[in-house]
Every structure is written in C-alpha cells, then in structure tokens.
UniProtKB/Swiss-Prot annotation:
Enzyme Commission number(s) of this protein: 2.4.99.17
GO CC annotation: cytoplasm
Subunit structure: Monomer.
Similarity remark: Belongs to the QueA family.
Class in the EC hierarchy, top level: transferase
Catalytic reactions on record: 7-aminomethyl-7-carbaguanosine(34) in tRNA + S-adenosyl-L-methionine = epoxyqueuosine(34) in tRNA + adenine + L-methionine + 2 H(+)
Top-rank lineage group of the source organism: Bacteria
Name this polypeptide is given: S-adenosylmethionine:tRNA ribosyltransferase-isomerase
Length: 383
C-alpha cells in the first residue's frame, strides 16, 4: 500500500494543546457499526468481567535540556548509564568536543550522527542520570504542542567570553556554565524556578508509571484515574503491565511512499513472567485482552510466538501494517493519530482500513481532540 492511502485532512484547531480539565473527562469514541461518543469515565461500561487490560508502565523522564544560545537537546536512546543518543536543535551549532557544565556536572558532545542526531556523554558528580534530569531537564512535550513556554530560568542565559568575564553581583548558587570549542561561556540556572501553570510534569505522565525511560508518554493511559482503576477491579476486570520505553522516533514521519520500505526505530521492551502468564491464561479462557496504547500492543505482539507470549527483555522495531497477523490483542484503546503516521497505519491494520478512515471522519466532524493531550477511542480487532 502507498503512504498516501493513509492521508486525511485534519484541521489544526483539533490538535489538543492542553489536557482536559480532569484526566477522565476527555471524550471516548467507541468504534462500531454505529459509533458511540461518550466520556472516558464510562469506559467501565464497555469492558466485561474477566477481561484483561494491559498497560505500559514506562515513566517519562525529563529528557529535554537547554544548552544555552537557543540550543536544546532531547535525549532519545540510552546506550549506557552515561551515554545517550539525542536530537539537537539546531545541531549545526554543536561540534564534537563541546562541553556543557551544569553546576559541577558536565555533558560532552562525542559524535554527530544523522541529521539532527548527536551522541552525548554525561560526566556527573555523585548523582544519577535520573536525578540530574529531574533537576535540570524538562518534560519533552511533542513538537505539535505549540504554546508559550513556561517561565524557566534555564532559558535566561548569560553569554560572555572567558577572557573578558562580566562581573555579576548576585548570581544564584545553582548557576552553571557551558564551554564550547569556540570559547563561548554561557551561565545557566537549573529548572528549580519553573512556573508550570499547565502542570505538564503531572499530566504528561500516567498515574501508574513506574520505570523511568520514556522520552514521550504512552498517551492512551493518560486518561486513567485511581477511581476508574478501582471500579474496574470491583467489576472483575483484570490488569497487567508491560514496559516499552517510548523513543522520540515515535514522532518521525514516514518518508517512503511504499510503506514497506519504512524502517522503524528500535525501542526497549520488557514483559515479566507474571504478566506473560496472565495474558496467556486470559487468552486460553477465551476472554478479551485490551491493549492500552499502541506501545502496549506492539510489545505484546512482538513477544508472541505461535500464540504464546514469552517473558523477557528485548528490543522491538515492529512495524504493523495491513495484513499483519494479530495473535493476542482483541481490543485497542488509543488516542487519535497523525495522518500518514506509523500509528495510523497500525490502527488501520488492527481495525480495518475503510473503518478507520470512516471513524476519523466522524471524529473530525464531532470536533474530537487529537494527539497526546486529546481524546481516546476504543477499537475492536477486525476478524
């Protein structure tokens, strides 16, 4: 199939810039011969006793760092505890060997890769990478969320030459400096002073996230509240968790007209023995398995061999296209996706090409909100 087959017209006004007032107050579209539009908190009515909801428990890290001079990097893939691949903007301003200081901690540019990508090495002073990012980083909101940046002292850089350093009377104790190959010095402050009126640190994170590693949220889970999870448990709906650390590559466009020529990025996955056993048991009993998000679906189907889900840690680059043989997942809860994206292609494979185009046409007519902070839809596997 051609990439253009998966195109549709999406009004920019439908791209959600902020989360709903409450997590479960977003809209939910139930796919079917007659679509049902309701509120997310009513999802309980569409699940049965004995069904299994599988969640991705990966936690978003504060992967966005300001390097001064209007340069930012977004960590993308962990190579080791101290080495990462990152997307830089603009990468042309960075050179191999550039050093960036945050208080007593240092980041070194070690390699320039494909367009926009770099390798960085962290040299941290008695602090873990996660604690470093918690102090100096920001939640990496997707590029399509375009709104005024929160007030952040790390954006207020003081630039000067080392040989002609300006004397500042009152510099906060947590100011830091950046040294680059062209001998510029930039002083930065950590993000302790962020004024975040939209509370992205909370709302761009699922309430059940546990394992740090994602640089983008598994957004289908953002709608769940403790109250909903408690009601599902009372009804007899079971839950299980897998881990897939979402990479920034999830936002990369498909650039080949022949979709089968597209190469997916790899992402780390993990399925515990307990989760594998409950998935297999549910399947054997003939009950429904509902994947909360495309990341969960991709993890489960990647780990399946002859209808049996295997436990373990692995990387997946699975690209699900029409004709894919789904062995495990019966239903998919997901947000609304980009036209011509790997995720829209995935849901067409799962729930039907014509059906998904019709569903999205209906969603657009109903002015449902799209993408990370948008509304959700519950899809049934086409058989």
């Amino acid at each position: 199939m051609k990439l253009s087959d998966f195109d549709f017209n999406l009004p920019s006004a439908l791209i959600a810039q902020y989360p709903s007032s409450e997590r479960d107050n977003s809209d939910l579209l139930i796919a079917g011969t007659k679509h049902i539009k309701t509120k997310f908190y009513n999802i309980i009515d569409y699940l049965k006793k004995g069904d299994l909801l599988v969640f991705n428990n990966s936690k978003v890290i504060k992967a966005k760092l300001h390097l001064g001079k209007n340069i930012t990097i977004n960590l993308n893939k962990k190579l080791s505890d101290n080495c990462w691949i990152a997307f830089a903007k603009p990468a042309r301003k960075l050179n191999i060997g550039d050093e960036f200081y945050f208080d007593t901690h240092k980041i070194i540019i070690t390699e320039k890769l494909a367009i926009g990508e770099i390798k960085v090495k962290f040299m941290l002073d008695n602090i873990s990478i996660i604690k470093f990012l918690d102090k100096y980083g920001e939640i990496p909101l997707p590029f399509y969320i375009k709104r005024p940046s929160p007030v952040c002292y790390s954006n207020m850089a003081l630039c000067c030459k080392p040989e002609n350093t300006l004397k500042i009377k009152s510099i906060p104790h947590n100011m830091s400096k950046i040294v680059t190959n062209n001998s510029n010095t930039v002083n930065l402050r950590s993000n302790d002073g962020i004024i975040d009126s939209t509370n992205d640190n909370d709302r761009y994170q699922t309430i059940y996230s546990q394992i740090e590693g994602s640089v983008a949220a598994p957004t289908a889970g953002l709608h769940f509240t403790k109250n909903i999870l408690d009601k599902l448990k009372t009804k007899g709906v079971h839950t299980a968790f897998v881990t897939l650390h979402v990479g920034a590559g999830t936002f990369l466009p498909v650039k080949t007209e022949n979709i089968h020529e597209h190469k997916m990025h790899t992402e780390y996955c993990s399925i515990t023995t307990e989760t594998a056993e409950i998935i297999n048991k549910t399947k054997q009993e003939g009950r429904s398995i509902i994947a909360v998000g495309t990341t969960t679906l991709r993890t489960i189907e990647s780990a399946c061999n002859n209808g049996i889900v295997r436990a373990g840690n692995f990387e997946t680059d699975i690209f699900i296209t029409p004709g894919f043989n789904f062995q495990v997942v019966d239903m998919l809860l997901t947000n609304f996706h980009f036209p011509k994206s790997t995720l829209f292609i995935l849901i067409c494979a799962f729930a039907g090409f014509k059906e998904m185009h019709a569903l999205y046409k209906y969603a657009i007519k109903e002015k449902m909100r799209f993408f990370s902070y948008g509304d959700a839809t519950l899809l049934y596997r086409k058989v």
